[in-house]
Amino acid sequence: MLKRLDSDLQTLNDFLKTKTPEAWLNHAAANIPLLLLDHAHCERKAAGTAINFISKYPEKAELVAIMAPLAREELLHFEKVIDIMKQKGIVYSPLQPSDYASNLHKHVTNKDGIERLCDQLIIGAII
């Protein structure tokens, strides 16, 4: 089991190309409630975004076929994070949106159509 975990971590580290800074790890470990709250919000937003794509582009059958199970999966992740938070006595509450996502969304084209969809999908992949 440990060999497999080491192998999985090595695969992940190879993919990321850079080591996570120790300061970030220490900050995250010292702020688990905030980390979990942020994670819950990210899962909720991912589910909502997938549902919004289904609503906005119902004529794109392939997109709908991909987004429906994605929305379901992200909502399940949301529920799992909420359960972990409850076990730890952490209350799900509002969280100030990050500037990172807001700044990315400023670059989405104002045109409707495929260009806007592509911009939104690229930003979703980045986030």
What are these regions (language model features)?
Residues 1-127:
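Non-heme di-metal
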